[in-house]
């Protein structure tokens, strides 16, 4: 293999470029914008920087946040001090760091939009406004709004959620997560360096309705959007049936990140899965164990074993988590209440935040802890009314 073209310079494409170039493979990355401020909270959990320590140990501006507050309408709020902090970047700074790492590794970085992609004779021909390029293999990292129809996942309206929000010139020291009635999604407030990212993501509601919900919350919390910068973006959020037909690979190409639909269908988190899929794709490209015609199958298998099967399982939970009821209240309401009353349950949520608790094993863990959790809730309920000074 002489040359790999990477179509897109976000976290997935940039990290794949670094891995391939570091291994000595000639790598060209093409992206119209390169580093830019993509609409996103910008948070990386322990799972990401434990796997890739450079995401924490670097000189790029970032915030480390340990305090998180989850709230649900009608249930109040529950605070949580994270055992492992969340690392929050502006997406411009994160993308710039990853692209610089790729360039230092030897990747050729080109600011250009790919206008067409054609395959003939086992090779690819790419055209940009600057000319044409031939490549032996392509990694598709073009994001959720992939303009190249022959490669990458095929998203339908049912397989997306909308995210919108504001960059607000204010400061706070904690993350806020707010669940709202009848919304398959949530509001977030992420503190960044010099500003807040305040946003909402949701499935099945128009942008105007989501924006109204968000601005009502901001007004209630005293967060002004008058001098803030508005943003919006479409996120992949594959429904359960879409996973079996998700198009992540084909002859001569592998898709990564949003272009492969690899986003958590419950939280909307995509950064870790972008970086991880870029890593896995580069492993498959470099592997001599798989001839070119076997690389698509090898990549699908690797994705499923690593995290895609867990995301697929999560897609079946998403609607139930946000809209179902538990003990005469919504699931988010009970979750917030249990967090306040049960250290065991709080520990489960801690691990979900850190990314160390997957969806596949969640039910079994909850059942194992059920007796202790209920006992803690009952004892806290009783003794809060018996111990002087507690309410």
Whereabouts are the PLM-identified features?
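Beta1/beta-strand and adjacent pyrophosphate-binding region of the FAD-binding site
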Residues: 1-12
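Nucleotide donor/acceptor-binding cores
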Residues: 2, 25, 137
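Glycine-rich FAD pyrophosphate-binding loop
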Residues: 5, 18-40
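Predominantly flavin-linked oxidoreductase catalytic cores and closely associated redox partners
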Residues: 9, 101-229, 242-245, 261
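Conserved Rossmann-like nucleotide-cofactor binding loop
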Residues: 12, 35, 145
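A conserved beta-strand/loop capping segment in the N-terminal third of enzymes
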Residues: 44-97
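FAD/FMN-dependent oxidoreductases across multiple families
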Residues: 116, 206-285, 289-297
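C-terminal helical "tail/cap" subdomain of flavin- and related membrane-associated enzymes
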Residues: 286-391
């Amino acid at each position: 293999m002489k040359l790999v073209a990477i179509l897109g310079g976000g976290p997935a494409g940039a990290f794949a470029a670094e891995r391939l170039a570091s291994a000595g493979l000639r790598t060209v990355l093409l992206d119209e914008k390169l580093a830019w401020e993509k609409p996103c909270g910008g948070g990386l959990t322990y799972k990401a920087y434990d796997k890739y320590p450079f995401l924490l140990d670097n000189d790029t501006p970032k915030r480390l946040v340990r305090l998180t507050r989850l709230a649900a309408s009608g249930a109040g709020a529950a605070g949580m001090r994270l055992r492992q902090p969340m690392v929050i970047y502006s997406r411009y700074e994160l993308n710039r760091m990853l692209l610089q790492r790729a360039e230092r590794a030897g990747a050729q970085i080109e600011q250009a939009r790919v206008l067409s992609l054609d395959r003939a004779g086992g090779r690819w021909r790419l055209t940009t406004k600057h000319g044409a390029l031939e490549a032996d293999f392509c990694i598709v990292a073009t994001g959720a709004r992939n303009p190249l129809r022959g490669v990458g996942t095929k998203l339908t309206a049912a397989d997306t959620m909308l995210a919108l929000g504001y960059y607000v010139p204010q400061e706070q020291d904690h993350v806020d997560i707010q669940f709202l009635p009848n919304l398959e999604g949530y509001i977030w407030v992420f503190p960044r360096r010099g500003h807040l990212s305040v946003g909402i993501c949701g499935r099945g509601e128009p942008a105007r309705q989501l924006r109204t919900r968000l601005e009502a919350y901001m007004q209630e919390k005293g967060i002004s959007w008058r001098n803030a910068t508005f943003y919006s973006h479409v996120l992949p959020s594959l429904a359960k049936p879409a996973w079996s037909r998700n198009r992540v690979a084909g002859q001569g190409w592998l898709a990564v990140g949003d272009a492969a639909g690899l986003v958590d269908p419950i939280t909307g988190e995509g950064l870790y899965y972008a970086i991880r899929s870029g890593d896995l794709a580069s492993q498959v490209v470099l592997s001599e164990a798989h001839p070119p015609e076997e690389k698509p199958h090898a990549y699908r298998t690797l994705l499923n074993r690593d995290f895609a099967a867990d995301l697929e399982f999560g897609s079946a939970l998403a609607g139930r988590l946000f809209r179902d009821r538990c003990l005469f209240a919504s699931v988010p309401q009970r979750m917030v209440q249990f967090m306040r009353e049960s250290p065991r349950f709080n520990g489960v949520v801690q691990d979900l935040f850190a990314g160390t608790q997957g969806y596949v094993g969640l039910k079994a863990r909850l059942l194992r802890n059920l007796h202790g959790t209920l006992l803690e809730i009952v004892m806290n309920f009783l003794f809060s009314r018996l111990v002087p000074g507690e309410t």
